[in-house]
């Protein structure tokens, strides 16, 4: 998926206020033909531009129609649910939410926190094995990883070689349910 498919601009809404440009931490936005555009190679996908745009000209890509098509096709779809979602929307447990998601057509729901637990064990192991004391950077946050790779490439080797928790959770869900 390209970055322009994740962050999208509604060109008709842009009023050239430049708030997105002023607030982008990596200066990955330029104006061309009076429309803000993301410089893909520099964007770290932090979504700061979405948060500050008073015109709502920047939006996240909506995957809901694609998910609905996959569910409608009859495939077994597993929802990987981040624990923050449960807290934010007042669900008591993944089980309660799973019932709701199944009514919407999902086959199962999986608690993505399980991926973080596995990742924590791997981080602990790697840090214990580390011979030399050096700066290490977690691979947990894709924005941080992208920032390091685009702005501080000399630190790329300091990123711990561990899959992000969402990927670990997806693999665990596949193991458990497929």
What does each model-identified segment do?
Residues 12-14, 90-91:
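Short, surface-exposed ligand-recognition loops at beta-strand->loop->(often short) alpha-helix junctions
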